[in-house]
Amino acid sequence: MISLESQVLERHLPLFADKSVLLAGGVNDDFPQKIQSQCRSVKIWSWYFDYVNQIQGKSAVDFSVIFTGRADLIVYYWTKNKQEVQFQLMQLLANAPVGQEVLIIGENRSGVRSAEKMLAHFGDIGKIDSARRCGLYHFTLQKQPNFELENFWKTYRSPQLGELIVYSLPGVFSANELDVGTQLLLSTVKDNIRGDVLDLGCGAGVIGSMIKLKNPPAKVTMTDIHAMALASAERTLLENKLSGQVLASDVFSHVEGKFDLIISNPPFHDGIDTAYRAVRELISNAKWHLVPGGELRIVANAFLPYPDLLDEYFGGHKVLAQTNKFKVYSVIG
């Protein structure tokens, strides 16, 4: 199965013939495998570990914040996060030779129309197709942009975080300020947490870092699927002189061992749609990753049907804190 964006690209396969091709951005389907026989080589640069985990062994894939490879043709799948797009495209073009050919594809609702404005200063760009509610643009590089990783780092502090300084890169959830859901969840974190703690879907590492700050004996593991989140969490730990393990995992896919506390502000947005797969997987499998008597604690929008899921898999739940928009739920394994 291929996405709407890839269906549009399929109409232009002669542009791929006998070329080395790099697919980047929000690519998340089987299109790379479909075009392998027509291209000299196909490689993927993805920031999303759930996709990387799914296609590993089928396609050459690079899961990293920084990518230094080159290709005759770059195919960029536009994402809804404009800062993320700018980070990736500027990095790719700074590393590319003058004359580099780029195809940019995206759903209209994701904001792909802004591609022309973003790239006009660096070369020739024009729309070559419009179908499936998507726009396809062809770009030729004439002037390489400047790209400095350090310019993209953001930091912030918050009264609720004490001395903690949060470091984040574009595309990371709550990258510029402490979100209200995490704030409510942290209000339930005291200095009595011991043992092994898993911060699942860690973003910039705020929750796990605060637990470590308040509970130095706790052994904290942080996971996420997003490469930028993992890099941000690692730096947040490092700059605050805190210890912890940071690893890529699609929910529990690469998590080993059992935990005294699994804590999360789980994502419920997938691209530009709302999705519950990860949350259902988190709740349905958490029991197998908790020690006897271990706790799963999550914060969620009050309108989401998580209480039903928690009751289904744990036989009940407690509400530790709530506002008119958010609730913190707790269940014991």
Swiss-Prot record:
InterPro entries: DNA_methylase_N6_adenine_CS, Mtase_sm_N, rRNA_ssu_MeTfrase_C, RsmC/RlmG, SAM-dependent_MTases_sf, Small_mtfrase_dom. It catalyses: guanosine(1207) in 16S rRNA + S-adenosyl-L-methionine = N(2)-methylguanosine(1207) in 16S rRNA + S-adenosyl-L-homocysteine + H(+). It comes from the Bacteria. Keywords: Cytoplasm, Methyltransferase, rRNA processing, S-adenosyl-L-methionine, Transferase. One of its GO terms (cellular component) is cytoplasm. It is found in: Cytoplasm. Its EC number is 2.1.1.172. One of its GO terms (molecular function) is 16S rRNA (guanine(1207)-N(2))-methyltransferase activity. The keyword rRNA processing applies. The keyword Cytoplasm applies. Monomer. Specifically methylates the guanine in position 1207 of 16S rRNA in the 30S particle. NCBIfam families: PRK09489.1. Belongs to the methyltransferase superfamily. RsmC family. HAMAP family: 16SrRNA_methyltr_C (MF_01862). This is Ribosomal RNA small subunit methyltransferase C. It comes from Mannheimia succiniciproducens (strain KCTC 0769BP / MBEL55E). The lineage of its organism: Bacteria, Pseudomonadati, Pseudomonadota, Gammaproteobacteria, Pasteurellales.
